[in-house]
């Protein structure tokens, strides 16, 4: 992605802040059928590796987990805040009329390698961590133990864990 130098952000803590604030990201992969994009919630594990690690899951019915080669390079795109900027907002527009519209946005492109985890124990851990993170702000957070055990077991068998080691 082209980023003008004066807009580039390289502070890892700021990149991680955006990723945490906007966890629904687009996982871009390339497989035998060509390019693919999946919109998935991710949890950032900032302490894993020099740049962190992303964990999540996909439906077992999603061909992603079988079509992408092990340790494939992937791109995960986190979209933050964005908005239109009118030329009318610039004082110079009223003086010189030398202004044009633009769009301001924040986005993080996390490059990494994809690992698939077809293991119920791993998937249970991923779901527990995602649930804990996303239910934390709820007045009465849902817990995995709130679901009937047989139903939860069926749901866990229907998903596959994914992990992206950010490079």
Kindly give the residue locations of the regions a language model identified.
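Binding-site signature for planar aromatic cofactors or substrates
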Residues: 1-167
């Amino acid at each position: 992605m082209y980023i003008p130098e004066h807009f580039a952000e390289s502070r890892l803590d700021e990149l991680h802040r955006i990723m945490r604030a906007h966890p629904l990201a687009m996982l871009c992969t390339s497989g035998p059928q060509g390019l693919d994009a999946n919109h998935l919630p991710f949890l950032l594990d900032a302490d894993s590796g020099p740049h962190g690690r992303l964990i999540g899951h996909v439906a077992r019915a999603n061909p992603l987990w079988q079509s992408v080669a092990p340790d494939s390079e992937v791109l995960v795109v986190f979209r933050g805040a964005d908005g239109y900027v009118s030329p009318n907002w610039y004082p110079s527009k009223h003086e010189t009329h030398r202004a044009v519209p633009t769009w301001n946005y924040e986005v993080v492109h996390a490059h990494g390698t994809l690992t698939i985890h077809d293991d119920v124990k791993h998937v249970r851990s991923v779901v527990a961590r995602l649930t804990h993170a996303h239910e934390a702000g709820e007045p009465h957070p849902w817990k995995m133990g709130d679901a009937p055990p047989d139903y939860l077991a069926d749901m866990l068998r229907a998903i596959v864990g994914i992990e992206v080691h950010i490079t």
